[in-house]
């Protein structure tokens, strides 16, 4: 939960869209670039220790008892404004002399935590949008540097951002997220609208084979399927961009040579 802190917030001009998202993070842009993006903690644990990634929105939103990210978390948190990301950064990363606020383009890998979890969202004031499977480097528009609690200068553009891939995309509709909510076994939400309509079969309370572990496993399978579809979408857009660029080249330089 966010603690209220008193901040001296300086108004600065920045070229971001009202639809963009923001994440405070201790990792530097070079670290993010080497990693290929803002990856979830669970992915690193899976690589280093073979720990299965838990792609469960409800458990992600709850975090651990201490308020930290779960070791096997399959989501990356963002919020809706630069100011809110700054507040979260000061609360979580205030002990750092320096951290960064990354600006993220909207896309269907982002889920509205409050919209999907409704009244069961544990920290609604955070206005979180969670990125399923993390945020690829090509989705990061740029970043702000925060030094000793103050945002310094304007946004630095990410040279690896692919506006052609993300232009016109929007976040996932809540209807796509209800089945990924990941509520625990016998949780009342599974008997309520809208979740009861979208509940995976293994999560329906009146199912004779209903078990918490089976429900969680089903949620992970569905989440991975959604992530796979998002990656396919980017690949299709990348291919379309390539062919459009090739057509432009042919239009200027004449017909393409046949091999």
From Swiss-Prot:
User: Which residues of this protein are catalytic?
Assistant: 128
Q: Matching SUPFAM superfamilies, A to Z?
A: ADP-ribosylation (SSF56399)
Which cysteines are cross-linked by disulfides?
A: 203-215
> Which residues are the signal sequence here?
1-18
**Keyword Nucleotidyltransferase carried by entry:** no
Give the UniProt family note: Belongs to the enterotoxin A family.
GO MF terms held by the record: toxin activity
User: Which purpose does this protein serve, as stated in its record?
Assistant: The biological activity of the toxin is produced by the A chain, which activates intracellular adenyl cyclase.
Record protein name field: Heat-labile enterotoxin IIA, A chain
Residues binding NAD(+), per UniProt: 23-37
Self-association and partners: Heterohexamer of one A chain and of five B chains.
The alphabetized UniProt keywords are: Disulfide bond, Enterotoxin, Signal, Toxin, Virulence
Q: Which GO terms describe its cellular component?
A: extracellular space
* Keyword Plastid appears in the UniProt entry: no
């Amino acid at each position: 939960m966010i603690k209220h802190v008193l901040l001296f917030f300086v108004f600065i001009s920045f070229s971001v869209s009202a639809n963009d998202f923001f994440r405070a993070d201790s990792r530097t842009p070079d670290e993010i670039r080497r990693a290929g993006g803002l990856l979830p903690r669970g992915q690193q644990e899976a690589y280093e220790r073979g720990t299965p990634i838990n792609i469960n929105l409800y458990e992600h939103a709850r975090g651990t008892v201490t308020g930290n990210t779960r070791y096997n978390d399959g989501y990356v948190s963002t919020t809706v404004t630069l100011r809110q990301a700054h507040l979260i950064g000061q609360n979580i990363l205030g002990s750092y002399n320096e951290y960064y606020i990354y600006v993220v383009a909207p896309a269907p890998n982002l889920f509205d935590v409050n919209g999907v979890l409704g009244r069961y969202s544990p920290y609604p004031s955070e206005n979180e949008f969670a990125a399923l499977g993390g945020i690829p480097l090509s989705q990061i528009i740029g970043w702000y540097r925060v030094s000793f609690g103050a945002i310094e200068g304007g946004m630095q553009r990410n040279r690896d951002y692919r506006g052609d891939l993300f232009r016109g995309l929007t976040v996932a509709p809540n209807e796509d997220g209800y089945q990924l909510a990941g509520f625990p076994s016998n949780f009342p939400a599974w008997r309520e609208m809208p979740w009861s309509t979208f509940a995976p079969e293994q999560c329906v309370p009146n199912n004779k084979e209903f078990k918490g572990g089976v429900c969680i496993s089903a949620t992970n399978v569905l989440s991975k399927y959604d992530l796979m579809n998002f990656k396919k979408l980017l690949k299709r857009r990348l291919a379309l961009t390539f062919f459009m660029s090739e057509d432009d080249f042919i239009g200027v330089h004449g017909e393409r040579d046949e091999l």
